[in-house]
A protein has these predicted regions:
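Short, well-ordered alpha-helical segments
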Residues: 63-78
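Bacterial N-terminal signal peptides
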Residues: 9-20
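Bacterial N-terminal signal peptides that target proteins for export
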Residues: 1-10
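A short, ordered amphipathic alpha-helix with a cationic face
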Residues: 18-21, 62-65
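Amphipathic, charged alpha-helical segments and their helix-to-coil junctions
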Residues: 26-61, 81, 85-117
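Generic intrinsically disordered, low-complexity segments enriched for polar/acidic and small residues
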Residues: 14-15, 71, 89
Length: 117
């Protein structure tokens, strides 16, 4: 029973995150474009990472901003559910892998990059 409550709560948290990201307007399309181009990728723990050394300061700033917002959400969800923020991040990463555009790169726990088709 506790597991199902945690799953429901984490699902609500994930939906809240997606709504907050989509509400940001101009950042969302540029983030998807950066994902498709392989400039940024998603890590197994729900952290956005820069994949290319040539990424400019605007890209790095966007990544920092997205990760700061994600950290807040992960920590808030973790506190409410009595779980670790990393657990929340991993659940988010699984959902993100389903919703991210084709071409997005994902870094697995094994250190290997895989591109979404």
């Amino acid at each position: 029973m506790k597991g199902s409550r945690t799953a429901v709560a984490l699902s609500i948290l994930i939906v809240t995150f997606f709504v907050s990201v989509c509400a940001r307007g101009a950042d969302a399309p540029s983030l998807d474009d950066l994902r498709r181009k392989g400039v940024v990728g998603e890590r197994y723990d729900g952290v956005l990472v820069v994949r290319t050394e040539s990424a400019d300061s605007a890209v790095r700033s966007l990544v920092d901003s997205v990760n700061a917002k994600r950290r807040e959400i992960y920590e808030s969800g973790a506190k409410k559910q009595g779980v670790g923020a990393q657990e929340v991040g991993k659940v988010y990463a699984l959902e993100l892998s389903k919703k991210a555009p084709a071409g997005t790169w994902f870094l697995g726990e094994d250190g290997k990059w895989v591109q979404k088709k």
